[in-house]
């Protein structure tokens, strides 16, 4: 039995007068390259300008930290520059779905105003193309 395939239906103006804000997001590329590190339980993470995000979880958590010379670096995209209603649905899904279709791995952290989506630095060209084809704008 073959796995199901999924096609994303994009609503047109003929379907409905509303256009989802999730379908056309501006993603700003944050300066620098980042590494993902496991947060050690009980050890405080330095809160200097080099730490982008810290996530605490059942496993201890993780840290997104800037390290421009890292061998396995990640690039950070930010979707929080444009205001959107807090009850807007599908914001993150609209970003990660086209990347998943293209086999581009992601690591994500949420902030109050938006999401940080990390993609491997060696796959940025492919990721940017997938995102643009999905209707998003990627800007430096």
Report residues per predicted region.
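Phosphate/ribose-phosphate-bearing ligand recognition and processing surfaces
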Residues: 117
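Regulatory modules associated with amino-acid/nitrogen control
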Residues: 2-105, 126-140
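A short glycine-rich beta-strand->turn/loop micro-motif centered on a GG-aromatic cluster
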Residues: 105-114
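Conserved short segment within the HATPase_c
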Residues: 123
């Amino acid at each position: 039995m073959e796995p199901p395939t999924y096609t994303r239906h994009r609503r047109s103006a003929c379907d409905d007068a509303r256009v989802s804000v999730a379908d056309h997001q501006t993603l700003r590329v944050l300066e620098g390259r980042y590494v993902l590190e496991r947060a050690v339980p009980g050890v405080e993470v330095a809160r200097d300008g080099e730490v982008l995000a810290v996530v605490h979880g059942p496993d201890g958590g993780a840290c997104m930290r800037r390290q421009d010379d890292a061998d396995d670096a990640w690039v950070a995209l930010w979707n929080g520059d444009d205001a959107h209603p807090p009850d807007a649905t599908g914001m993150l899904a609209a970003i990660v779905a086209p990347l998943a279709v293209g086999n581009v791995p992601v690591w994500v952290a949420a902030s109050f105003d938006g999401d940080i989506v990390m993609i491997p630095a060696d796959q940025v060209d492919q990721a940017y193309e997938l995102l643009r084809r999905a209707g998003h704008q990627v800007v430096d």
